[in-house]
């Protein structure tokens, strides 16, 4: 669908200020999330992690930083490995059964979904997301 202001096709979720595929810094995303204060709800800052936090302390400090900047709603999203037995884990080998990772999953609206079950458009959208290493 053509955006009336931009005059071109511009895909964005209704609960975000910056598209997930936009090549911008995580700080720009955080600053944009301050606009959520002017909404009645339904807006959320998605931080797509290219890798997990190195420690609990790193995750905690970053989360406190978001709160101190006035971000109301946010979600850390990272790819999760899945083996053929449908166990989810991080890494190359399943921590439950020892089988290798054969698929990736990602949280979509609060639940885990396998990438290989995505429709073409969702696969494309996921490939275009800007991922961050924090």
Task: Give the label of every model feature segment.
Residues 1-134:
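Long, C-terminal-biased catalytic regions of enzyme "large/alpha" subunits
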């Amino acid at each position: 669908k053509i955006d009336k202001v931009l005059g071109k096709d511009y895909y964005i979720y209704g609960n975000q200020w910056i598209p997930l595929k936009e090549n911008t810094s995580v700080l720009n995303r955080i600053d944009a999330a301050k606009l959520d204060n002017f909404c009645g709800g339904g807006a959320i800052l998605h931080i797509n992690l290219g890798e997990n936090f190195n420690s609990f302390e790193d995750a905690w400090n970053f989360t406190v930083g978001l709160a101190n900047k006035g971000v109301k709603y946010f979600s850390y999203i990272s790819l999760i490995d899945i083996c053929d037995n449908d166990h989810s884990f991080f890494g190359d080998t399943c921590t439950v059964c020892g089988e290798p990772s054969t698929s990736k999953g990602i949280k979509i609206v609060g639940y885990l979904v396998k990438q290989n079950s995505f429709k073409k458009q969702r696969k494309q959208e996921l490939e275009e997301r800007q991922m961050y290493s924090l």
